[in-house]
Amino acid sequence: MNYNPKRTRFRKQHRGRMKGISYRGNTICFGKYALQALEPAWITSRQIEAGRRAMTRNARRGGKIWVRIFPDKPVTVRPAETRMGSGKGSPEYWVAVVKPGRILYEMGGVTENIARRAISIAASKMPIRAQFIISG
């Protein structure tokens, strides 16, 4: 899966700041088990995909996985050994802005110990601390 928007209104964005906690996307909606972020961070599309792959490999054919975050923020990088000035760099990769409390992945249709194992492996792929939660 290639996670990036099909088209955006603008090619480049400001960095912004990650203040406070997540008020949207912080409840379990689809599955029974979930991975919840405990720290603010930018999570790249590659990290999201690595976590998803780890979960699917661990759950094998049972269960369903939902990815609740989408990388819609372009991160620009300047070429190496370039002098200051001459505009902003070109978009290099995409990130999802994640605040504490945000649900990253959800899982359903499997037993709790399988879900716990799969989600803990996905959590180790993330650049932040995250916790396993159960709905209800």
Swiss-Prot record:
Compartment annotation: Plastid, Chloroplast
GO CC list: chloroplast; ribonucleoprotein complex; ribosome
GO molecular function, one term: structural constituent of ribosome
PROSITE patterns xrefs: RIBOSOMAL_L16_1, RIBOSOMAL_L16_2
Alphabetically ordered keywords of this record: Chloroplast, Plastid, Ribonucleoprotein, Ribosomal protein
Biological-process GO terms, alphabetical: translation
Bridged cysteine pairs (disulfide): none
Stated family: Belongs to the universal ribosomal protein uL16 family.
Quaternary assembly: Part of the 50S ribosomal subunit.
Protein's UniProt name: Large ribosomal subunit protein uL16c
Organism (species): Helianthus annuus (Common sunflower)
Lineage: Eukaryota, Viridiplantae, Streptophyta, Embryophyta, Tracheophyta
